[in-house]
Amino acid sequence: MTSKAVVFAYHDIGCTGIEALLNAGYEIAAVFTHADDPRENTFYASVARLCAERGIPLHAPEDVNHPLWLERIRQLRPDFLFSFYYRRLLGAELLACAARGAYNLHGSLLPRYRGRAPANWVLVNGETQTGVTLHRMIERADAGPILAQQAVAIDPEDTALSLHGKLRKAAGALLRDSLPLLALGVLPEVEQDESQASHFGRRTPADGLLDWHRPARQLYDLVRAVTQPYPGAFCQVGEQKLIVWSAEVVAGNHGREPGSVLSCDPLRIACGEDSLVLRFGQRGERGLYLAGTQLATELGLVEGARLRGAACSPQRRTRVLILGVNGFIGNHLSERLLRDGRYEVHGMDIGSDAIERLKADPHFHFVEGDIGIHSEWLEYHVKKCDVILPLVAIATPIEYTRNPLRVFELDFEENLRIVRYCVKYGKRVVFPSTSEVYGMCQDPDFDEDRSNLVVGPINKQRWIYSVSKQLLDRVIWAYGQQGLRFTLFRPFNWMGPRLDRLDSARIGSSRAITQLILHLVEGTPIRLVDGGAQKRCFTDVDDGIEALARIIDNRDGRCDGQIVNIGNPDNEASIRQLGEELLRQFEAHPLRAQFPPFAGFREVESRSFYGDGYQDVAHRKPSIDNARRLLDWQPTIELRETIGKTLDFFLHEALREREAQA
C-alpha cells in the first residue's frame, strides 16, 4: 500500500528529499515551504518550482503550527511527516498528525552539530568529517532516535558551497536506501548518545569578522566557511570594509603584530600564528571581485600597514539597565552578560549582597536605590541605556494574599512607569511576564500564542500578581503596535543558588524549595500544602539565564514583538516529589551531620498556610516551541542536578548564619 506523506522542505536538499520520496513510491499529499527572502542570496534550487512542475499542492504559511493548519494537515491523514531543511520547528501537535511518525534529515552526523548551519560550523571548526542523518522528530530539536547516517569527508579545500554539494549527494543516497525500508517498517532506530551532543546556533554576517590574533588556520577555515554564496569573512582597512573570498595559510609571521601587512604581492597578513595570504576579495559590499595584489593597490596598502579585525575594531558595548539587579534573575543575568564581554550593565536595587562579586568589574555600575523614589535616576538611565529589564516585582505567593495592594502598586504601577519611559525614549524593553499569567489554563502545555489565560474569582486575591502581569503584557503589546520594541519572557519555576534567603523563608516570603530547605536546616516538619500534589516544571537558572541572554542578544531582531516561555518541560515534578528528592540529597550531603534529624512531612491546607484569598493550580507546563525556534535554545540540566546545587548553596548559607551568630 502506498504511504502518504506531508513534507516540510526548503533549499535544494528539500528538492532532493521530495524527489527521493517520489522515487520511493510515496504519495506526497502536500508540501510546506518558505517564501524566498529577497535579502538572502538564494543560490539553491526552488522547492516551489519543483512542486509546481510535479503538480504537488504547495503552501508557505507564516506559522505551520497554527490550529488552522494543524486541522488541514490532520484532514490529509498522513502516514508520515518529513522535514528536509525546513527552517521552523514542528510542534508536538503537528508531529502527532502522522500515523507512523515524523522524520527529519539533518546536515550533520548527529548527535554532533545539532542546530542551525551545521555545514558552515563544521568548516569554521576545522572538522575533517561530517554527514547527513535521518532521525525521528521529537519535541527537542535534532534529538530524536537515528534511523540512518551517511558520512562525508571534508577536504582541506572545501568551501561551504562545495561541502553543500557533497551533503546533497549523500542525502540523495541515504534517502534512496532508507525510504523504502521505512515504508516497510523495518528500519531500526538507535537513541542518540546525549553525552556526545553539541549544539550550534544560527550564524549572521557579523560572525565573519576576522580576528587577526587567531591562528591563520582558523581564519582560513572561517573564510572557506562563509565565502560565496555566503556574505564572506571581512576586516576593516581604515574606514573601508575588505571582504575576503579566498585565502591560503603560509608558515611564519616574521614576529610582526597580528594584522600587519607582510607583503602586498602576494597580499600577506600576519596572524597570531603563521600568516594568511588573501588570494581574492573585494572592497565593500558593491566592489569588484579582485585578486589580492590588486586589492592591496586599490586600498593603498603598504608593507607594515595594519588591518583592523575583531580584536582592534572599536565597538561600544550594549548598555543594559537591570532594575532589581540584586535579585535572583538580576544577579545571575549580570554575571552572564559581563562574562560575554559585549555588555555594560547598569543596575539598581535596595540591596547588594548577591552582587558583591560583580562590583569590581569596570563594566558593572550599581546604585543602591528604590525605583519608586529615585525617579530622576531611573528616567536618565532608561534614556542612556539600550535594553531595559524591569525585574522589580513581588513574586512570592504569600504576599499576594497578605499584601495585594502593595503587589499591584509595585508590580503594575511602578513597572508601567518604566515601560512608558521606554516608549518615550524609543528603548527596547525585555519584560518579565510570568508563568502565572496562564492561571488555571487546562491545556496540557501552556502556549504563548494560543493558550487562554484563566484566573479565579475576585475574592481569591492571590490572582492580583497574575492579572497585574497580564495587564502589563497587554499594555506592552499595545505599545508594540505603535513601535515599541519589546520581548516578553515567562520564566517557569527557575531554581538555583542565590534564589532567595533563608530569612525570607522564615517569614513565609520565599519560593517553595527555600521553604522546604529551611525545614531541613531547622529540623522542623516539611509542610506540604494540600499534600504537595501540585506539579511544576522546574528550570535550572543557568538554562534560564542562557535563554534570557539570547533574547537580549536578539540576533536579526528575531525576538522583537515575541512572547517566550522559558522553562524545562522535562523537569516536571510535584512539590511532594521535590521534597522527597531534597530529603534524599540532604541525607547524603557531606554537611548532613551539622543539622538536626529529619522531622517528617506534614500535610497542611492551603487556607491555613496562605490565607483565605489563596487558590492553587494543579499543573504548569510550558510549550517551549518559541524558545527553540527564536533562540536555538534547549534546556539541558536535569532537576536532580539543580536541586543538588540549590541545596548545597543554602546549607552553606545556614552554616554562615550560625557562625555569624556565634
Curated annotation (Swiss-Prot):
Region (Formyltransferase ArnAFT): 1-307
Chain residues that bind UDP-alpha-D-glucuronate: 395, 400, 434-435, 462, 493, 527-536, 614
Pathway: Nucleotide-sugar biosynthesis; UDP-4-deoxy-4-formamido-beta-L-arabinose biosynthesis; UDP-4-deoxy-4-formamido-beta-L-arabinose from UDP-alpha-D-glucuronate: step 1/3; Nucleotide-sugar biosynthesis; UDP-4-deoxy-4-formamido-beta-L-arabinose biosynthesis; UDP-4-deoxy-4-formamido-beta-L-arabinose from UDP-alpha-D-glucuronate: step 3/3; Bacterial outer membrane biogenesis; lipopolysaccharide biosynthesis
Catalytic reaction annotation: UDP-alpha-D-glucuronate + NAD(+) = UDP-beta-L-threo-pentopyranos-4-ulose + CO2 + NADH; UDP-4-amino-4-deoxy-beta-L-arabinose + (6R)-10-formyltetrahydrofolate = UDP-4-deoxy-4-formamido-beta-L-arabinose + (6S)-5,6,7,8-tetrahydrofolate + H(+)
MF terms in GO: carboxy-lyase activity; UDP-4-amino-4-deoxy-L-arabinose formyltransferase activity; UDP-glucuronate dehydrogenase activity
Residues bound to (6R)-10-formyltetrahydrofolate: 116, 138-142
Domain of life according to the entry: Bacteria
Residue span of region Dehydrogenase ArnADH: 316-662
Coiled-coil ranges per UniProt: none
GO CC terms, sorted: membrane
Residue numbers marked as site, Transition state stabilizer: 104
Known partners and oligomeric status: Homohexamer, formed by a dimer of trimers.
Function of the molecule: Bifunctional enzyme that catalyzes the oxidative decarboxylation of UDP-glucuronic acid (UDP-GlcUA) to UDP-4-keto-arabinose (UDP-Ara4O) and the addition of a formyl group to UDP-4-amino-4-deoxy-L-arabinose (UDP-L-Ara4N) to form UDP-L-4-formamido-arabinose (UDP-L-Ara4FN). The modified arabinose is attached to lipid A and is required for resistance to polymyxin and cationic antimicrobial peptides.
Family that this chain belongs to: In the N-terminal section; belongs to the Fmt family. UDP-L-Ara4N formyltransferase subfamily.
The protein, known as: Bifunctional polymyxin resistance protein ArnA
Origin species: Pseudomonas aeruginosa (strain ATCC 15692 / DSM 22644 / CIP 104116 / JCM 14847 / LMG 12228 / 1C / PRS 101 / PAO1)
